[in-house]
C-alpha cells in the first residue's frame, strides 16, 4: 500500500477511534430462554412476529419451543425459512414481502449469522422503503429505529446477536457487503443453550473458531478500548476452556452456554473495535463461492496472524495468557507462536482441512479487490495491505488446497 493511502487509512481509523465514546453503542438485553420472548413481545405491544430462519433449523425442529410459547401466549407469527448461508438480496426481498403481507411489527432472527443478518436487513428495509440494500451498505446509512428485533443464535460463533452489522450478498454480482448502523443491534439476544444442543460437531468447531477470530481480530487491532479488550479476553478464555467439550460432548449444556457467552463477548468486542483481513478475505470467499464463513475464518486465521509478524507479538502474548497457554514470564515471540500453533492444532483436532477447492486463479484479482474494498480504510488492522498484497492469501489457500489433495491421494 502506498504511503498516501496508508496515511488516509490511519487518519480515518483514528477519527473513528476518537469518536467511539460519543457513538450510541449499546449491548442487547440478554435473556436465557426462548420461552421469555412472548412476554417481551407483549410488553412492546407487538401483534404479529416474523421469524426468519432456514430450512435446516426447521428440519431439526429447533423453533418448536418458541412456536409453542407464542401459541400459548396467543401471539400470531409467520415463518420465513428460505434463508441460505451467506444470505442474498433475494432472501431479504422475499422475507420483506412476507413481513408486509402478514402485517408484522416484530422480527426474530432464529439461527446462525445468516438468519440474523437477514432479519436485520429486513428490519432496515422495512423502515427505509425508498432505499435499496445497496444504498445502505457502508456506515451509518440506516438512521431509523427498526421494528422490535430479537436474535436467537443457534450457533456459538457469529456474534450477530450483538453487532450493528448485516452482511448480505448481491444475488446477481455475488459481491458481499455489510450494512453497519446502530439501529441494527438487536434489542434482545436470547442465549438459550438448548437450541444449540443438536449442533453437529463440525459446525460447533467452525462457528466456535469464528467467535475466536472475532475476539482475536478485535484485540490485535489499533482501535481497542478497555471494554473491548476485556470482552475479547473473556471470549478467548471461554472458548479455549469449552470448545473441545462442546465438540466432543454436544449435550453438555454448560459448555454450550459458555460458548454462547463467548460468542456474545466476542461480538461486543468487534462491534466497537472491528475485525481485520481474516474477515475481509473470508467474506470475499463466501460471496463468490459460498464458502461457509466460520470455515473460511478457521483456515485463514493462522495464515493472517503469521503474516502480521512480530508487530502483534505482545498482544498475542496476552491472548495466550487468557487461553492458558503462557504466563507473564514467557517471551513475547514464544507466547505468540504458542497461540498461533494452538489454533493450528485446534483445526487439526476438529478435522478442519486447508481446502478451499473453489478458488480459481483468474478470480483472485477480483476477490482481493473485494477484500481491499471492505477492509480499507475501515478496519484498524495491525499492518495495512492493499489488494495486490492481499492476493497472497488466495494463493496460499490454493497452495494449501493442492497439498491437502496430494496428501489425500497418497493415502
Question: Language-model segments: which ranges?
Answer:
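Glycine/threonine-rich beta-strand-loop-alpha-helix active-site module
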Residues: 90-194
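Glycine-rich phosphate/pyrophosphate-binding beta-alpha loops
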Residues: 157, 264-297, 375-378
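An N-terminal, well-structured beta->alpha segment
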Residues: 1-73, 77-79, 400, 404, ...
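N-terminal small/polar loop signature for handling phosphorylated ligands or for N-terminal nucleophile
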Residues: 50, 58-130, 245-256
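Active-site pocket-lining segment
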Residues: 291-354
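Carboxylate- and glycine-rich phosphate/diphosphate-binding segment that chelates Mg2+/Mn2+
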Residues: 68, 165-273
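C-terminal charged capping/lid subdomain of soluble metabolic enzymes
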Residues: 2-7, 326-411
